Regions:
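Boundary at the C-terminal end of the N-terminal hydrophobic targeting segment
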Residues: 16-22
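Short hydrophobic "helix-edge" motifs at membrane interfaces and signal-peptide entry regions
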Residues: 8, 57-59, 283-284
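A cross-kingdom marker for long, charged
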Residues: 260-322
Length: 322
């Protein structure tokens, strides 16, 4: 149970959408990407070695902002020279505000909801013949049995498939932030992080329309069929400061999150909290480092757009100096 919970919460850090699947595909409304529209003047290739950096500053403080991938290879290699230099003497390192878990008594409710999601026998038995063939081929390539996907819920099947796909191809949502946190703590730099309670969102999964859940499952299946090529290419672009190339990464889960009751409010809260944390870091003279997922960082009404709206100075990777 602990492992299943961990997998579900990991996927929900960027995803969500479910409900019982129909025997034949149902035409759902299109999924909306909350970060589809970017602030184009912020999408600039970095001129320094390694990944691209933005800055947010006032009269006596600079926050160096590193936009990080939402999905990347585990233990991804990147040029850390600029990061290491900025870590020295930093007031704080703000990690991505993407941590989600069931807190306190909410863990019990989350566990009960998960049991409901994991009931119903092999998921593939509920699929139309054409989709069943695709799904069976995908799970067999991952080395998994039909029993492994025991659920009547499209989201639960999609989450499990996504987790298995990521594990098989050694992809993660936590790098490079995990390495940055380790280096910051080793250097004695205070780490700022935030964890959200997944309980309410997990309950909302069960109320999401079946057609939307099916569409999310289809997107995950298509990603598993396509393989990790897009993600690996985007990761290489990110490591070289090619912001436009890095933005080509998969967007399955972010669109699904918006379809869940409360999903838009949750996305709004994470962006607002990230912007507020950067603004608070400016209250102390000196400099700090912040990591923010790349698209939420650069989107219209994203983190940098909000900070510019507060009158703070934002510079692009084409302007940032060492």
């Amino acid at each position: 149970m602990r492992m299943i919970v961990a997998l579900l919460l990991l996927a929900l850090a960027a995803l969500a959408a479910p409900a019982a699947v129909a025997q034949t595909p149902v035409a759902p409304p299109p999924l909306v990407d909350p970060d589809a529209a970017l602030v184009e003047e912020l999408v600039v290739t970095g001129r320094l070695p390694g990944p691209a950096w933005w800055t947010v500053s006032d009269a006596d403080t600079t926050v160096y902002v590193l936009g990080v991938p939402s999905l990347a290879p585990k233990r991804m290699q990147w040029d850390r020279a600029i990061f290491d230099k900025r870590l020295q003497g930093a007031n704080a390192v703000i990690l991505p505000f993407t941590n989600i878990r069931a807190k306190g008594v909410g863990a019990l409710g989350a566990g009960l909801n998960l049991l409901r999601l994991r009931a119903g026998g092999p998921f593939e038995a509920r699929l139309d013949p054409a989709t069943r063939v695709r799904f069976v081929a995908a799970r067999e390539r991952l080395g998994e049995s039909a029993k492994h996907y025991s659920t009547a819920n499209a989201l639960a099947a999609g989450v499990q498939l996504a987790a298995d796909y990521r594990e098989r191809h050694e992809l993660t949502t936590t790098d490079p932030a995990k390495l940055v946190e380790l280096l910051a703590r080793r250097s004695g730099v205070p780490v700022v992080e935030k964890t959200y309670d997944i309980g309410p969102l997990l309950g909302a999964i069960l109320r999401t329309p079946a057609a939307t859940g099916r569409l999310c499952f289809e997107e995950v299946l298509a990603q598993a069929e396509a393989g990790p090529g897009i993600t690996l290419q985007a990761a290489r672009a990110w490591a070289s400061g090619d912001v436009a190339g890095a933005l080509e990464n998969e967007r399955t889960y972010e669109r699904c999150l918006m379809a869940v009751p409360g999903g838009r409010q949750f996305d709004e809260r994470m962006k607002a909290d990230s912007a507020a944390a950067i603004a608070r870091a400016l209250e102390r003279p000196g400099h700090a480092i912040a990591l923010v997922p790349l698209r939420p960082l650069l989107a219209e009404r994203g983190v940098l757009d909000r900070l510019r709206g507060q009158g703070l100075k934002v510079t692009t990777p084409g302007e940032v100096a060492e």
